[in-house]
Amino acid sequence: MIGLRPAFSTMLFLLLLTGGVYPLLTTALGQWWFPWQANGSLIHKDNLIRGSALIGQSFTAAGYFHGRPSATADTPYNPLASGGSNLAASNPELDAQIQARVAALRAANPQASSAVPVELTTASASGLDNNLTPGAAAWQIPRVAAARQLPVEQVAQLVAEYTHRPLASFLGQPVVNIVELNLALDALQGHRAK
């Protein structure tokens, strides 16, 4: 019995430390230093939660920028079903999906003459990505401008305004948050696109 006492004391100490003190401390520090991020990076407009800056949404109307395809099967951008498609690059099913997406994008963007950006045809690893490269957003500008009856230059300026650049070039590439950009388009016109 004497040999079990140190083991039990150590177990109880570690249980309290890792199951109580550490989680409470990290939660408190997160709330103190990074409250917006610790609470889900929620985007508020008109006193309502419109989305998260971390999770994409399904925008299908012509007046909105479209994000990457969602890999969640039943409901696009369902965070409960997060995960990649798990299809290998050599899988014919992936090739068929990409070809179908390219055809749909070409039909929806007849003004675009350049190649369809890769990230508009392939899902991200999580299937919930909300960011595009500035090039992929720029590829959609003519469609969005025409649908909203806005000058192309004004929409391009909005894309440039919502392009997030890393602190240093070796820390990543510039990205455009599609949720924020589409909400800014709505705010610009004071309504939602049809």
From Swiss-Prot:
Task: Kindly list the GO CC terms recorded for this protein.
Answer: plasma membrane
Q: Which HAMAP family match?
A: KdpC (MF_00276)
UniProt key word Transmembrane helix: yes
**Name assigned to this protein:** Potassium-transporting ATPase KdpC subunit
Query: Is the keyword Ion transport assigned to this protein?
Result: yes
Q: Which InterPro entries match?
A: KdpC
User: Where in or outside the cell is it found?
Assistant: Cell inner membrane
Record's keyword terms, sorted: ATP-binding, Cell inner membrane, Cell membrane, Ion transport, Membrane, Nucleotide-binding, Potassium, Potassium transport, Transmembrane, Transmembrane helix, Transport
Q: Which family would the database say this protein is a member of?
A: Belongs to the KdpC family.
Please explain the role this protein plays, according to its UniProt record: Part of the high-affinity ATP-driven potassium transport (or Kdp) system, which catalyzes the hydrolysis of ATP coupled with the electrogenic transport of potassium into the cytoplasm. This subunit acts as a catalytic chaperone that increases the ATP-binding affinity of the ATP-hydrolyzing subunit KdpB by the formation of a transient KdpB/KdpC/ATP ternary complex.
